[in-house]
Amino acid sequence: MNPFHASCWNTSAELLNKSWNKEFAYQTASVVDTVILPSMIGIICSTGLVGNILIVFTIIRSRKKTVPDIYICNLAVADLVHIVGMPFLIHQWARGGEWVFGGPLCTIITSLDTCNQFACSAIMTVMSVDRYFALVQPFRLTRWRTRYKTIRINLGLWAASFILALPVWVYSKVIKFKDGVESCAFDLTSPDDVLWYTLYLTITTFFFPLPLILVCYILILCYTWEMYQQNKDARCCNPSVPKQRVMKLTKMVLVLVVVFILSAAPYHVIQLVNLQMEQPTLAFYVGYYLSICLSYASSSINPFLYILLSGNFQKRLPQIQRRATEKEINNMGNTLKSHF
């Protein structure tokens, strides 16, 4: 539920009316906004909801939770927060940009969505740093890499995300535009306010964490290559070479980071491009909505990446299902005994 969406919606009709074929352009925009986009977001919402609930349930029910499990569980929770706002976004799109759920819910949904952006970026960054220490310097900061400390770190990241999202809690509200449509938007009337807020959100959620994430993985790749060369020269197994399980976890986190970059980069680039545009073009309008779909799609893709890339999840799912079945059978047995 991005605050920029409402302004984009209201400029789209005017923009398309100036295109080659007014009637065709208007009909196309209407179909895209009220049918195609809501349908796409609806599919993403359904898939992501099931997948992320499955991941959270699997980790919570696991007897042995690792440090990466805690980070992945928090990412899944963040994705669920992201998905919670999707039905409201679908409804607003389907009604031509009109918000009918009232001001308080507009503020809550918009603020939680922004908070999720901060949380995802922060968790992804800290998880990348954790992978660096687990792989390259496993004996450093060991007292911080415990399950208890990791839970506290993640709680701190969530608290910081709520604080960073305070401007959205204050300024997001239902706004009535010139065409009479009331939309849930971010009430920034000054161009300077729009500029500073866009830079603030883009830098803190993408351009600041991105270099940290990339540095961590460049160092990991350099270390892995160095260990490979040492093994090749010595023609033996070096005990300092990372274990296969650590490498699998690192590979999984690396793929998650790549998905994070590919899904978030288009949206943030378009936000910066918008600052330089006096009148959005049709290409910008289409690109903006595609970037929205990409950002939401990552919430659906992530849980399946956890399952496909992590051997632990593939082993845990049948075990948890078996334990749940056994528990259900025992409960049925106890119920039958109580009746006889």
From Swiss-Prot:
Q: Please cite one Gene Ontology biological process associated with this protein.
A: neuropeptide signaling pathway
Molecular-function GO term, any one: G protein-coupled peptide receptor activity
Which ranges does the record list as Cytoplasmic topological domains? 61-69, 130-154, 222-252, 310-340
Its cellular-component GO annotations read: plasma membrane
Q: Where are the transmembrane segments?
A: 40-60, 70-90, 105-129, 155-175, 201-221, 253-273, 289-309
Instruction: Give the bilayer topology.
Output: Multi-pass membrane protein
UniProt-annotated glycosylation sites, renumbered to this chain: N10, N17
Q: In which tissues is it expressed?
A: Specifically expressed in the brain, with highest levels in cerebral cortex, hippocampus and amygdala. No expression detected in the cerebellum, thalamus or hypothalamus.
Subcellular locations according to the entry: Cell membrane
Question: Which superkingdom heads the taxonomic lineage of this protein's source?
Answer: Eukaryota
Topology Extracellular: residue spans: 1-39, 91-104, 176-200, 274-288
> Quick check: keyword DNA repair in the entry?
no
Looking up SUPFAM superfamilies in the UniProt record yields: Family A G protein-coupled receptor-like
Q: Which UniProt keywords apply?
A: Cell membrane, G-protein coupled receptor, Glycoprotein, Membrane, Receptor, Transducer, Transmembrane, Transmembrane helix
The task this protein performs is described as: Receptor for melanin-concentrating hormone, coupled to G proteins that activate phosphoinositide hydrolysis.
Instruction: Family membership, please give it.
Output: Belongs to the G-protein coupled receptor 1 family.
Query: What's this protein's name?
Result: Melanin-concentrating hormone receptor 2
Q: Gene name, please? A: MCHR2
